[in-house]
């Protein structure tokens, strides 16, 4: 709804609820076409949208096949940090900082962005950050309007993922 070539506002927002609904809305659209077999609708979630695809498949019984590719569990990383490194006190401090940022954003009338994928890349980053860089910051995946290639997501998007474990019901798919 608020990324890529969509026209939605506010821009640069990731939301487990809204982005899950985007998948379900696509199924709504497809299921109304005579040339689509409603019993053969599938979805694919790439990178951070893998968790949203699994969440959509958990709630929408019309989805008959679900694929995730290079899945990145945004809810887990936002709640627990990379490698589950964040404790309860650190998580509370993160929430405090992000809510302070909401106030700043409201006063400014615009969202502060996270900055996208780190560039230049430090030597000691985890392998998956190197993979992000190798994709989003090179000709292979760079795009001038890509969030990850450039300014990144709005900083406060992380709040909605902290208490939303997207993969908690995936066994129901």
PLM region descriptions:
Residues 170-173:
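Conserved small/polar residues in nucleotide/adenosyl-binding loops
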Residues 54-139:
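Alpha/beta-hydrolase-fold enzymes
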Residues 1-3, 72:
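Short beta-to-alpha linker loops that shape the active-site pocket of alpha/beta-hydrolase fold enzymes
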